[in-house]
Structure formats: structure tokens, C-alpha cells
């Protein structure tokens, strides 16, 4: 079931903190789309008649949106506009699913993450220009390096006396880079890897996979008749030192090394993500070894 939920800001009796609570409540429902909107004061409506009573100031031209109320200031509305943009880009697009899931662990509530990211965009002037998909990833990484992790590293290091601050910071950033790479390949078979991407892990195993008929028949049955080169071009294999999804869900390094197979011929109809199959490194090694011995 496709779940699309709307939140309207600027309603009477709802202040900024109450809206934050409503956002967090709705976010926990994990809708496919979370749409933030702003109260429209249309002529002839009940809200139009009560605007003065509620202290509602609104645009006199389309889209007639609220600018402030007795409970929410103009600055509050502007901040929520920023949150709306971040939710649209980083949540509703489904292009950053695991990255956002991971980063959520460093905030008390989902709203706080989007609010902080919006403030970072404003601080750096990023909201004034259009950005491509790869640029959005670069900004998210910059956000983590310069703002987000800088706040939590001290607490994490204090909790683990055996690690110094740089080590904890580095671990968190490297985990994020791996998760971001996962999100990128989930949507697109990249022609070139981003500069921040990890080294290609298990390259020999990935190369041998496409030449192993038993493996391709098992994991890529719809590519029967294709050559190894054709399968390699239409799919992607990426090795990771961890279980990406388990790590993103827990906020900590989880699982054993694995190779993920991204099949772009089969996609999720709602998120457009490629079909992903996890193959353990031990399984790959065993299969390739048997073929070599045979």
C-alpha cells in the first residue's frame, strides 16, 4: 500500500514545537511520501473569515499561504520552508534512504535532523542554486564532516575512553561514505565513482562472478544468453566491509563483509530502486574456488 501523508503548517493553536511533534509522529509511520504544506487562506473559507481572530497574516496573491499566526512567527514559517525542501530532496525522492536512516541515529528526533540540515543549507547558501543528484550527496557528506559529526564525536569519544576523537569521527564518516555509495548504486549504475567513494573491495571476486555460469544462472536468471561483458554492463557488483542495511538501521557497524549485486532490469515500482541481492564473501570465495579446482 502506497502511503502518502500530509502535514499542514500554520493551523490555529499550533506552535512550532507542536508541529515538530506532529512531524515526528507522522514520520514514525514511515510513509512513502511525507508532504509538508502550508495553510492556504482562500476567500470565502472559514479560515478567511477568522484570519484576524487568529492573527493569521497570509499572501494576498496565489498561493495565499500563511506567513505568520498568533502561534507561529514569520521566522518559524521560513524555517519550516527549509525543512519542507530537505524532506522533499532527502526523504521523498527515496534516493538517500539508507544514508538518512543512518544519520537519524545521531539526533533525538527525525524533525531535528531535517531542521539542522536545512539550517546548514541556509548557512552555506546552498538553497540559492539548483543542485544535481551527485551534488546533493556531496553536500550531505560535507554536512556530516563539518557540522553534524563534530557535535557528537566528543560524546562518543567520552563514552569510549579507548578511542580518541579522530578515530571515532573517522569511523562514522567512513561508514556514511559506504552507505552513501550503496544509495547511489541502488538508483543508478554509475559511469564514474564519486571522489569520496571507498576503494573497490573484492574486485577479483566481482570480476570472476560474471564468468561463473552457475553463479549467474542462480542470481541473474533473466540474463540467460547474455555474455559476461553484457551482464557486467547492465548490472553492478559492489563489495562492502559491512552489512549496509543492518548498519544503517542500527547506527553501528554490523554484519560480515558482503558483495551486493544491483540488478537494474528489476526495480521497485515505488522507489525505483534496483533489485539488490546480498552475496556473502565466503560464498563467492567458495564458489570461485570450486570452479578453479574443477
What kind of region is each of these model predictions?
Residues 1-113:
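A structural motif corresponding to the C-terminal lobe/cap of the Radical SAM core domain
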Residues 85-294:
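Radical SAM enzyme core and accessory elements
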Amino acid at each position: 500500500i502506497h502511503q502518502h501523508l500530509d502535514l499542514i503548517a500554520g493551523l490555529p493553536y499550533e506552535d512550532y514545537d507542536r508541529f515538530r511533534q506532529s512531524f515526528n509522529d507522522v514520520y514514525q509511520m514511515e510513509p512513502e511520501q511525507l508532504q509538508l504544506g502550508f495553510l492556504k487562506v482562500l476567500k470565502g473559507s472559514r479560515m478567511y473569515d477568522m484570519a484576524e481572530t487568529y492573527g493569521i497574516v497570509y499572501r494576498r496573491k496565489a498561493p495565499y499561504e500563511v506567513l505568520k499566526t498568533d502561534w507561529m512567527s514569520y521566522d518559524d514559517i521560513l524555517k519550516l520552508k527549509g525543512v519542507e525542501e530537505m524532506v522533499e530532496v532527502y526523504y521523498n525522492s527515496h534516493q538517500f534512504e539508507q544514508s538518512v536512516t543512518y544519520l537519524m541515529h545521531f539526533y533525538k528526533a527525525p524533525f531535528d535532523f531535517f531542521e539542522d540540515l536545512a539550517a546548514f543549507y541556509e548557512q552555506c547558501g546552498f538553497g540559492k542554486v539548483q543542485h544535481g543528484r551527485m551534488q546533493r550527496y556531496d553536500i550531505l557528506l560535507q554536512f556530516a564532516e563539518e557540522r553534524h559529526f563534530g557535535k557528537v564525536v566528543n560524546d562518543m569519544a567520552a563514552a569510549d575512553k579507548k578511542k580518541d576523537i579522530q578515530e571515532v569521527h573517522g569511523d562514522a564518516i567512513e561508514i556514511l561514505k559506504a552507505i552513501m555509495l550503496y544509495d547511489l548504486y541502488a538508483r543508478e549504475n554509475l559511469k564514474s565513482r564519486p571522489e569520496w567513494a571507498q576503494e573497490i573491495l573484492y574486485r577479483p571476486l566481482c570480476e570472476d562472478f560474471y564468468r561463473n555460469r552457475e553463479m549467474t544462472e542462480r542470481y541473474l536468471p533473466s540474463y540467460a544468453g547474455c555474455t559476461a561483458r553484457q551482464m557486467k554492463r547492465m548490472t553492478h557488483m559492489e563489495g562492502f566491509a559491512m552489512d549496509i542495511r543492518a548498519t544503517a538501521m542500527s547506527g553501528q557497524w554490523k554484519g560480515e563483509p558482503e558483495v551486493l549485486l544491483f540488478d537494474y532490469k528489476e526495480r521497485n515500482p515505488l522507489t525505483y530502486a534496483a533489485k539488490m541481492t546480498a552475496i556473502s564473501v565466503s560464498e563467492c570465495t567458495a564458489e570461485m574456488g570450486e570452479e578453479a579446482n574443477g
